[in-house]
Amino acid sequence: MEFDTIAAISTALGEGAIAIVRVSGDDAVEKVDRIFKGKDLTEVPSHTIHYGHIVDLDTNQVIEEVMVSIMRAPRTFTRENIVEINCHGGLVSVNKVLQLILAQGVRLAEPGEFTKRAFLNGRIDLSQAEAVMDLIRAKTDRAMNVAINQMEGRLSKLIGLLRQEILETLAHVEVNIDYPEYDDVEEMTHNILIEKATHVRSEIEKILETSKQGKILREGIATAIIGRPNVGKSSLLNSLVQEKKAIVTDIAGTTRDVIEEYVNVRGVPLKLIDTAGIRETEDVVERIGVERSKEMMSQADLVLVVVNYSEALTNEDEDLFRAVQGKDFIVIVNKTDLPQAIDMERVTELAAGNRVITTSLIEEQGIDELEKAIADLFFEGTIDSADMTYVSNARHIGLLTQAGKTIGDAVEAIENGVPIDMVQIDLTRTWEILGEITGDTVHESLIDQLFSQFCLGK
């Protein structure tokens, strides 16, 4: 495939030590060489870096002191010639360098266009391309490992093996239908077809079994911290985040809005939501906060219910316990540094088998136990993201679910005595659906939509 030459700033905008302008295309080296004062870039070997200056051709003025990396096709990310200009960090100089490159007939890249070219030029498939964005957005080491595994093609390999198995089955069916007189070809009986289709369905189900953990690693666990005013919700947020994000006072009702913060808890990404204290109030602003707290509680994957060790349970406390029944929740009995007034037996009863953890956040006690409880709740204490392939992308999960249902329909049809040639439709459709994950059978409009979500310069 031949494309025009594109360029974009690949580093985050703002002040920094280094900013990089990336250029990709057949004539990328020649275009940059026009404004580069130093070695002749068209003559240097691939995968080398060179010192020089960027010059404004109209004024012959030196604009930047740079290091230029030359990478020639096909051993590059896009499989095109790539030039990366390492400038001093800062908005003015790097933008000036970009403008000088564009003035040489280079087009400004669209968001994700470099990765899109890597896909279109066959260097990576669609699932690997999507993993690039997952890596950029990873919030924990485990999420990073999952993204790297997918970038290396582990999911692609699994999908490829399944598609190959379906294709071989379809070919076998075709031969049996079109050339029944061939004695040297094994007959495709209903039993053999059921065995092959069932195996594919089983493998799809195995991949889908990792989707819950994969989705958590990719998107995080939406975790609502709820409780009456002044029981220590904001203190809990600050303890987990390990810095002061929420205002903590002895005045009930200090938190009037929802505060969100991501935190890494033993490799598990939590999207922590500190909510306004839930109570009856005449204050209009606080009442709005209370309603939002209830909404966040209903949407959360995990609820941390905070109660006060130094106070007896109230009707409002018991209402909160009833509201979270049916959800994953952990009870935090805070302020154990104060004299006990709470009925712990009643707390255990209301927890209904969920973990109850005592803490004194002011004395930094109980946080380690809480973090372990969270990790145990979602991963049973273990998750081997380095060796396992986790499916985490919602698009992939949807397609795998659809493929599993379609191949399941094929199995059911065979068991009901439907002629083998009619089952070909479901088998072919399963093969096509799985191909949408890797991009082998995907529509161009979907490709454009997916890559538009990438950042500029990637």
Curated annotation (Swiss-Prot):
Binds 1 potassium ion per subunit. PROSITE patterns: G_TRME. GTP binds at residues 230-235, 249-255, 274-277. Pfam families: MMR_HSR1, MnmE_helical, TrmE_N. Its main location: cytoplasm. Its cofactor is K(+). Its EC number is 3.6.-.-. GO terms for cellular component: cytoplasm; cytosol. Keywords: Cytoplasm, GTP-binding, Hydrolase, Magnesium, Metal-binding, Nucleotide-binding, Potassium, tRNA processing. One of its GO terms (molecular function) is GTP binding. Disulfide bonds: none annotated. Residues 220-379 form the TrmE-type G domain. It is found in: Cytoplasm. CDD domains: trmE, TrmE_N. Mg(2+) binds at S234, T255. (6S)-5-formyl-5,6,7,8-tetrahydrofolate binds at R22, E84, R123, K458. GO terms for biological process: tRNA methylation; tRNA wobble uridine modification. K(+) binds at N230, T249, I251, T254. It comes from the Bacteria. Belongs to the TRAFAC class TrmE-Era-EngA-EngB-Septin-like GTPase superfamily. TrmE GTPase family. Exhibits a very high intrinsic GTPase hydrolysis rate. Involved in the addition of a carboxymethylaminomethyl (cmnm) group at the wobble position (U34) of certain tRNAs, forming tRNA-cmnm(5)s(2)U34. Homodimer. Heterotetramer of two MnmE and two MnmG subunits. This is tRNA modification GTPase MnmE. It comes from Bacillus cereus (strain ATCC 14579 / DSM 31 / CCUG 7414 / JCM 2152 / NBRC 15305 / NCIMB 9373 / NCTC 2599 / NRRL B-3711). The gene is mnmE.
